[in-house]
Amino acid sequence: MPHLPLASFRPPLRGLRPTRCFPRSHSLSTQSEPHGSPISRRNREAKQKRLREKQAALETGIAAKGKPPAESTKAWTPKEIVLYEIPTEHGEKKDVSRPLPPAYSPRYVEAAWYPWWVREGFFKPEYQTRLPQATGETFSMCIPPPNVTGSLHIGHALTVAIQDALVRWHRMRGDRVLWVPGSDHAGIATQAVVEKKLWKERGLRRRELSREDFLREVWKWKEEKGGEICQQLRVLGASLDWDRECFTMDAGSSVAVTEAFVRLYKAGLLYRSRQLVNWSCALRSAISDIEVESRPLSGRTELRLPGCPTPVSFGLLVSVAFPVDGEPDAEVVVGTTRPETLPGDVAVAVHPDDARYTHLHGRQLHHPLTGQLLPLITDCAVQPHLGTGAVKVTPAHSPADAELGARHGLSPLSVIAEDGTMTSLCGDWLQGLHRFVAREKIVSALRERGLFRGLQNHPMVLPICSRSGDVVEYLLKSQWFVRCQEMGEQAAKAVVSGALELSPSFHQKNWQHWFSHIGDWCVSRQLWWGHRIPAYLVVEERAKGNTEDCWVVGRTEAEAREVAAELTGRPGAELTLERDPDVLDTWFSSALFPFSALGWPQETPDLARFYPLSLLETGSDLLLFWVGRMVMLGTQLTGQLPFSKVLLHSMVRDRQGRKMSKSLGNVLDPRDIINGVELQVLQEKLRDGNLDPAELAIAAAAQKKDFPHGIPECGTDALRFTLCSHGVLGGDLHLSVSEVLSFRHFCNKIWNALRFILNALGEKFIPQPLEELCPTSPMDAWILSCLARTAQECERGFLTRELALVTHALHHFWLHNLCDVYLEAVKPVLSHSPRPPGPPQVLFSCADVGLRLLAPLMPFLAEELWQRLPLRPGNTTAPSICVAPYPSAHSLEHWHQPELERRFSRVQEAVQALRALRATYQLTKARPRVLLQTSEPGEQGLFEAFLGPLSTLGHCGAVGFLPPGAAAPSSWAQASLSDTAQVYMELQGLVDPQTHLPRLAARRQKLQKQLDSLLARTPSEGEAESQSQQRLSSLQLELSKLDKAASHLRQLMDASPSPGEL
């Protein structure tokens, strides 16, 4: 087939059905993130600090002055969708015998490949041992098991994109790779979602059902959502070994959880005690620290809470007087943000060195509500410079007060019940009232008694239960705890010794601080959904009137009965055992995942072969709550660290820098970005969710503002590439849909490049072996050098796990080296008859190697295009690009010529100068003559070697040389490349000065106004001075060019003959 320009090549289509893409229009954004350049640790930490400060400002609303980057209101032009409709059985290989569609269509590209990959077993470690490039090394990872609370969000997509890129790279290298899929039962989160669903659909509360009936409802939810999550992972291209899929509530996990609990108990690392815990009154359960959101308040704030008919005020400090016993006019004033806990006060504390209270040491005070006498105690923990320097002590409802009370032997009074109402210890006037209703009644009582001393705004941090939205209380409860100090010390030492590597390294500081201050871990939850605690209460021992309950632990009730018999000295058959109704914290079973997923506690082949894991990759927000606990329990239970390396990526935030939240309406479903979605559908998804009416209104409004035209179809590969292109090991990732769309255009560039290459190769092309390919022209040598350098950069990026380096290198090669330069330069060469043999071989190698380099990040596009390349002689090509060898830097280093690339960059400078001149003089079709002049020795030879590409890329005619020192030709436009080199472009006969000068003047006037405006205005707050200076320099340079162009045109006009002379 003769050569055709890229844009005009339209092969006949069979088996394709074009459809019109929806939605019809979409918003675009100009926001983009720099990526690819490593920064120093010090700069990275400083950047992290600034980002944290900025985020705090955003979330508390005090950064209103700074405007967030806005999505452009420009509508996105819909693209034609081409569907793959060739009959193909599920799991059969896709038919690639038909010509490529004329334009990239994600739905066509992504069809059929994944089921074939799975059926062929490419994702199984057993397959990889048979690969010709097999290294004998093992690489194992487990996916952070997503919660079965709903579908995956964009944060999960980031995790999958990073992990799958690493996994595919190791697999293509020839490593024996295992990537274990799984999902987490997410006790509190799932139970809360199902409870909301039951209330919304059937008007039922959980306790109106039996435990068994409720659990059946949860299992139904799990089956529905678990399948949806697995499908999403497949859509994202996650190359997981699905035959090893596990769930944290399946039979194997249950055995592992029970075994871990029993072993820890026998080792003295697990015990039952009455201690303060985080308590959600709405859920009536203890909750973990990660389920407590710290909400900063700058002052008085009204919040709506579960169970409260009216909003509740927070951020207020109430001052209360405690009269001194025996001195009618003396009192000690304390401030509190929680007057509802006043009935639980057992003392007032001051600092021993606070001179204001020295005379009251050892005295007693009257409780402002009951009149009971309370001691005034001294303790160095009190901060005398805060408020009045005196604090009330409520050991039953404050962790700090509990420690203080323990030091002074004070007995706690629990005045708030599990359901958030006041207990009988408060007296009849408060008993049974909601705690925040009681708050108002207490303040009124203080006013009536003349002991109220004021109310003022007070900045504070309010603990909120992320699952229920209720304010978290600290209650004294009998719970099961894991002793963490000894295990925590071992975890801290592992990082110090280098046995455990945290990347980025700045996370080591948080790690060491957390483990040096770690407390015991409350692992029991008052829920129905989860792993039932394998502990049993011996009823007979409680009946004896023992002050402490008698609990025994066993893998089964029979084992527990044997333990109870030995403990009590009574026959086991005579004992009554009641199993603890509580379940274990979800993080307990999640902490076992790296080894329970491989079969522990059984000694399975997978456990022996793949444990410890090679790498743990997850979000930085899970460093302490999940990673830390995996390290503690893994080391304790298996005798080994569960992994030696931890890679922590950043949080994904929206374009305004806000955390993704359903109530904000900014949560992005990866499928909506992949497939595109109309605004109406987005809004319907919100209405189908579990948001309350107030949250729904806020979320819908935000969604309408952010995506007025919906979301365009971008495809899986573009989404994955975007997520990996950010420097996710540093600051948070601010995702913009328009950025994903730009990488969809990049996919289209690659698509068109391969259509051009395949057309240029023709049907009879036979590729040379890669090692035999030798460039026959400087242009061929240059592109192969670029390809070799790209392989080096990709290898370095994967080895250091800085995927932004990989994406940057690939983007630069495909777009700027291959498409923008080499393909354009080689078109005239390919049009010659007969065609020289060199360029087609180079094109094939660029396509083959380039696609294999790209495959870990864009697996669908790479497979679709690579399958269409001609086979090398001997047909030894791998069946799929998934298992084809990844190009090594070493195998291509003979092509790498840094000096040639440096020299050609000089040619590119000349090309850019010529294009700029053409734009200035609006030479759209003409191909003017060009002269080059250089006084640098040897530089003329450099240009001579690339005269053909220079003429083609610069869109000019004949290219000649002007001797050094020779006068510039009259009326030719000139541009300087440096102090030693200039280019000249002929204008005579190509430009009409009388027509063009007014255009230049109008353009100059417009730019001068912009310059004047920039000089006159004051830079906005937060605007970088360098940005303002850069814009200023750009305008001044453009004005200088226009002035120069106008001068050339006037010279041209003066040199032109008058009508009378003709």
UniProtKB/Swiss-Prot annotation:
Keyword Nucleotide-binding: yes
InterPro entries found in the cross-reference section: aa-tRNA-synth_I_CS (IPR001412), aa-tRNA-synth_Ia (IPR002300), Anticodon_Ia_Val (IPR033705), M/V/L/I-tRNA-synth_anticd-bd (IPR013155), Rossmann-like_a/b/a_fold (IPR014729), tRNAsynth_Ia_anticodon-bd (IPR009080), Val/Leu/Ile-tRNA-synth_edit (IPR009008), Valyl-tRNA_ligase (IPR002303)
Boundaries of the annotated transit peptide in chain numbering: 1-15
GO CC annotation terms, alphabetical: cytosol; mitochondrion
Entry's Gene Ontology molecular function annotations: aminoacyl-tRNA deacylase activity; ATP binding; valine-tRNA ligase activity
Catalytic activity: tRNA(Val) + L-valine + ATP = L-valyl-tRNA(Val) + AMP + diphosphate
Enzyme Commission designation: 6.1.1.9
Keywords: Aminoacyl-tRNA synthetase, ATP-binding, Ligase, Mitochondrion, Nucleotide-binding, Protein biosynthesis, Transit peptide
Keyword Ligase: yes
Enzyme class label: ligase
Single GO BP term: valyl-tRNA aminoacylation
UniProt-annotated stretches for the region Disordered: 1-73
Biased composition (Basic and acidic residues): 42-56
Binding site for ATP: 662
Ranges spanned by the short sequence motif 'KMSKS' region, renumbered to the chain: 659-663
Motif 'HIGH' region: positions: 146-156
Cellular location(s): Mitochondrion
UniProt-listed NCBIfam families: PRK05729.1 (NF004349), valS (TIGR00422)
Family affiliation: Belongs to the class-I aminoacyl-tRNA synthetase family.
Role of this protein: Catalyzes the attachment of valine to tRNA(Val) in a two-step reaction: valine is first activated by ATP to form Val-AMP and then transferred to the acceptor end of tRNA(Val).
Protein name from the UniProt record: Valine--tRNA ligase, mitochondrial
Native species: Sus scrofa
Upper lineage: Eukaryota, Metazoa, Chordata, Craniata, Vertebrata
Annotated gene: VARS2
